[in-house]
């Protein structure tokens, strides 16, 4: 009979956040697959847990899975942990979980801390709907493409970000309510709230990985409203704003995703 694979969430800063169930599982399993065995050893030593550790990080996860699956098939129980937080959420865990499921091995989540969720619930932004993006691509071109893709998203955005990249990210996203969360659950926990200029200014001297939370875009909602209007009604909206005919036609074309010549021809024939 196969063993079980446990995905065990661990504290993201404050060791008091570990759950009683997590401690029990870590004590009962045969092996612990850890993102960084040195970090996990500190956690285990604190709680006086002694178990064999197996290195399982993002650079060796796919190569390591065969050995882990073999142990599971032998009836051994394995706990997967990341350095902090929930395995599989921007951390190793997804690959081995998927493989275990393919092999009909039970995968059991042991809930606990997750930096993204902890930051969201204390952000003051909409928590009903949100999009978690984790780490953005390192490649500048791919990174820009991803930001352009999500800048009109109406749901709250959650991104793991480095301070020196915040300005470039926010320049593309545009001005709206923004929250920067850092050192979550630690002594120097901090939530920085403001608009784009305020956040960029306050983040210049900060260090370490942060959680960037961005209010959903209102522009997409406005575009949907405008697109439900007739062309004449759409024209009147911008005319009341004092725009020239040329400017109005350009904006209508952009709102509706059509060639501006089509809009120009419509009003020319009226």
Language-model region placement:
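Class I SAM-dependent methyltransferase SAM-binding "motif I" and its flanking Rossmann-like core
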Residues: 96-150
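Loop/turn-to-beta-strand initiation segments
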Residues: 4-5, 75-79, 155-156
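Glycine-rich, flexible N-terminal cofactor/catalytic loop recognition
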Residues: 1-56
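A contiguous loop/helix-start segment that scaffolds small-molecule binding in enzyme catalytic cores
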Residues: 2, 156, 160-270
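Conserved helicase motor
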Residues: 56-62, 136-139
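Short Gly/Thr/Asp-enriched flexible loops that form oxyanion-binding sites at enzyme active sites
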Residues: 88-103, 170
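Short active-site oxyanion
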Residues: 26-32, 104-108, 155-157
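Short glycine-rich anion-binding loops that position phosphate/pyrophosphate groups of nucleotides
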Residues: 12-15, 83-87, 163-165, 217-219
């Amino acid at each position: 009979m196969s063993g079980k694979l446990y995905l065990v969430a661990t504290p993201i800063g404050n060791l008091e956040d570990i759950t009683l169930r997590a401690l029990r599982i870590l004590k009962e399993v045969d092996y612990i697959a850890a993102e960084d065995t040195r970090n996990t050893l500190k956690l285990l030593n604190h709680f006086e847990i002694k178990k064999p550790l197996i290195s399982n990080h993002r650079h060796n996860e796919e190569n390591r899975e065969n050995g882990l699956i073999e142990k599971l098939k032998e009836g051994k129980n394995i706990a997967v942990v990341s350095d902090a937080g929930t395995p599989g959420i921007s951390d190793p865990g997804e690959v081995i979980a998927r493989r275990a499921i393919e092999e009909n091995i039970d995968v059991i989540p042991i809930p606990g801390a997750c930096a993204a969720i902890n930051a969201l619930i204390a952000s003051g932004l909409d928590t009903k709907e949100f999009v978690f993006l984790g780490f953005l691509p390192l490649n500048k071109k791919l990174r820009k493409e991803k930001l352009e893709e999500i800048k009109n998203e109406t749901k709250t955005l959650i991104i793991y970000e480095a301070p020196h990249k915040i300005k470039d990210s926010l320049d593309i996203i545009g001005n709206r309510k923004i929250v920067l969360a850092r050192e979550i659950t630690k002594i120097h926990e901090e939530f920085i709230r403001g608009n784009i200029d305020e956040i960029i200014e306050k983040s210049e001297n900060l260090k370490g990985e942060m959680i960037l939370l961005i209010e959903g875009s209102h522009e997409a909602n406005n575009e949907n409203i405008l697109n439900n209007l007739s062309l004449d009604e759409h024209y009147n909206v911008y005319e009341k704003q004092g725009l020239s005919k040329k400017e109005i036609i350009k904006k209508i074309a952009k709102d509706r995703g059509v060639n501006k010549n089509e809009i120009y021809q419509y009003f020319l024939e009226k």
